[in-house]
A protein has these predicted regions:
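Multi-pass alpha-helical transmembrane bundles in non-GPCR membrane proteins
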Residues: 3-160
Length: 160
């Protein structure tokens, strides 16, 4: 039976090490991204398994499934602009995240309606914004709220 009197060792819990670890991980990610070659898009990427049409809308189920992103983003934005999150220092990051969720629904819906490399950009671009704003939220919630707030825009710009 383990001794519950002693705290479990956690390297990121040691006072003063969180920020250096975060900077090291970030530096490794940036260096890796700069050194690796671009990933080519396979030619068959746009061939969906389910290509059924309904009401004249091609790939109907792929297109309409994006309504969930629009709905979730709308509910999230209502919470940000309502009383749920409005007083939080990270509310701009939450606003960008939920706004990006709406844009994911729109961009991905357009891509699945007309799948090609040009519309794929509008599928992926809002995802990059959402991922980076989510990273700022995680940094703010678990490391330091002010750092997360200040990193929002640099992270979003880095992501796009």
């Amino acid at each position: 039976m383990p001794n519950t009197d002693e705290p479990e060792f956690c390297p990121t819990c040691i006072e003063g090490i969180r920020i250096p670890v975060l900077l090291l991980v970030t530096a490794c990610g940036i260096i890796s991204a700069l050194l690796l070659p671009p990933i080519a898009q396979p030619s068959g990427y746009h061939d969906f398994a389910d290509q059924r049409s309904l009401f004249g809308i091609p790939n109907i189920w792929d297109v309409t499934s994006n309504l969930a992103f629009i709905l979730a983003g709308g509910i999230g934005l209502a919470g940000v602009f309502g009383k749920v999150v409005s007083r939080c220092a990270l509310s701009p990051a939450y606003g960008v995240f939920f706004g990006a969720a709406i844009l994911i629904g729109l961009g991905s819906g357009w891509y699945h309606l007309e799948p090609n490399n040009e519309t794929l950009v509008w599928d992926r671009l809002p995802m990059a914004v959402a991922f980076m704003s989510f990273l700022a939220i995680i940094i703010g919630e678990y490391i330091d709220m002010n750092i997360g707030r200040r990193l929002l825009m640099p992270l979003v710009l880095l992501g796009v």
